[in-house]
Regions:
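A short, surface-exposed loop/turn module that caps and links secondary-structure elements
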Residues: 32-57
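Compact soluble domain cores
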Residues: 22-36
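Short hydrophobic/aromatic-rich motifs at helix boundaries and adjacent loops
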Residues: 1, 14-15, 34-37
Length: 87
């Protein structure tokens, strides 16, 4: 099981979107247990400056950006809409 690490930016993003917590539970459970996410989350690697990150869609226009660090850490980097995150 991976340990969850939240960046300061993720913490700020989450404060703005605290109502999304329930939708995150299934995603986080699967990620910390290294289980594949269902297709509905559209999990995929990012490119460019985000090339070592992945994103998944919590809702149609609501994205979680994260990194799997080694075998032990799930780093939550950003959360928000595509426009908020510049994607």
């Amino acid at each position: 099981m991976r340990k969850i690490e939240r960046t300061n930016q993720f913490k700020r993003d989450f404060k703005k979107h605290g109502d999304i917590e329930a939708a995150l539970i299934e995603v986080l459970y699967k990620l910390i247990n290294d289980e594949p996410l269902p297709e509905k989350y559209q999990d995929h690697p990012l490119t460019g400056e985000w090339s070592d990150h992945r994103d998944c869609h919590i809702k149609p226009d609501f994205v979680l950006i994260y990194r799997l660090v080694g075998n032990n850490v799930l780093q939550l980097v950003r959360i928000g809409s595509h426009s908020e995150l510049g994607l």
